[in-house]
């Protein structure tokens, strides 16, 4: 055997089976075998797909050609009470006579309609300040006594506290209200020229004026619907009818909950409607469920 043949034979043996003139595959070594096994395991492991981002559907006003850029998204309520529309129809039917105290003695009926606009607005605000924790009949009586003396910012500031107290008694918390009325009247004279503020934020900054009063003042005095005026009647009835997504503990919580779903065109009506309903039918104690058209629709009817 020649030296060349010997070298070829030795090289062929070192390459192993499959070597030769066409032999270009080597038997995989230990490292290659481990890599191949790892690749095989990867190929059989579950593939993790990237999560798809959730898409929110938004409705737009206008025609199809107007959808997209520049279109304003519609606000669609995510929750509303069950049967609320039928309940509202029934309450309107029960209130169609408009013979509750609020219908004749409420804020809309306490001011002098012949007085100048500025004076009318002041009288509206004053009647609201007196109405807190007070029946409509008592508030109306106090307003009549005040108007008989000429109810203006100047006349109130010229009236001593003792006399003012006698005029507004027996409204609830009359002593505190004497102080608040005097303080608020002084602010109106100094900063608003005897008129009342035209915004909720400025109204609630006045002594003795809360959110319910502010929203009613905006509606009655300025003709602007700024929010739902929620008193104890509206608060109680909204919770009994489950008109709030969860039970609320205060009128302000109730206002925020109602404004989330109740159509804005109903915001002003709902106060007088529910106040009268609460005065006549849905009473705080011993409500007259047997006479209520919503007895079968009211979640609280069975437990009262």
UniProtKB/Swiss-Prot annotation:
Residues 43-55 have a biased composition (Basic residues). Residues 1-22 form a transit peptide. It is found in: Nucleus; Mitochondrion. The modification Phosphoserine is found at residues 63, 65. [4Fe-4S] cluster binds at residues 282, 289, 292, 298. Residues 23-42 have a biased composition (Basic and acidic residues). It catalyses: 2'-deoxyribonucleotide-(2'-deoxyribose 5'-phosphate)-2'-deoxyribonucleotide-DNA = a 3'-end 2'-deoxyribonucleotide-(2,3-dehydro-2,3-deoxyribose 5'-phosphate)-DNA + a 5'-end 5'-phospho-2'-deoxyribonucleoside-DNA + H(+). A motif (Bipartite nuclear localization signal) lies at residues 28-52. This is Endonuclease III-like protein 1. The gene is NTHL1.
């Amino acid at each position: 055997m020649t030296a060349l043949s010997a070298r070829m034979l030795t090289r062929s043996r070192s390459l192993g089976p499959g070597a030769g003139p066409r032999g270009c595959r080597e038997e995989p070594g230990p490292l290659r075998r481990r890599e191949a096994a790892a690749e095989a395991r990867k190929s059989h492991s579950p593939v993790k797909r990237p999560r798809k981002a959730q898409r929110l559907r938004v409705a737009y006003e206008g025609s199809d050609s107007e959808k997209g850029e520049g279109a304003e998204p519609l606000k669609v309520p995510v929750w509303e009470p069950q049967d609320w529309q039928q309940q509202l129809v029934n309450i309107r039917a029960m209130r169609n006579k408009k013979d509750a105290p609020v219908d004749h003695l409420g804020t809309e009926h306490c001011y002098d309609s012949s007085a100048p606009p500025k004076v009318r607005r002041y009288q509206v605000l004053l009647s609201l300040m007196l109405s807190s924790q007070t029946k409509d009949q008592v508030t109306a009586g106090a307003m009549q006594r005040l108007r008989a003396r000429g109810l203006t910012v100047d006349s109130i500031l010229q009236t001593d506290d003792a006399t003012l107290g006698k005029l507004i008694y027996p409204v609830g918390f009359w002593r505190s209200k004497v102080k608040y009325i005097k303080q608020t009247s002084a602010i109106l004279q100094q900063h608003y020229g005897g008129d009342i503020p035209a915004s909720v934020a400025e109204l609630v900054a006045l002594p003795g004026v809360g959110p319910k009063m502010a929203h009613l003042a905006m509606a009655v005095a300025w003709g602007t619907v700024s929010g739902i005026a929620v008193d104890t009647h509206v608060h109680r009835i909204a919770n009994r009818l489950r008109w709030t997504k969860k039970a609320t503990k205060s009128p302000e919580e109730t206002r925020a909950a109602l404004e989330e779903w109740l159509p804005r065109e109903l915001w002003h009506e709902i106060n007088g409607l529910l106040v009268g309903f609460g005065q006549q039918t849905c009473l705080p104690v011993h409500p007259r469920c047997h006479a209520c058209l919503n007895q079968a629709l009211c979640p609280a009817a069975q437990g009262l």
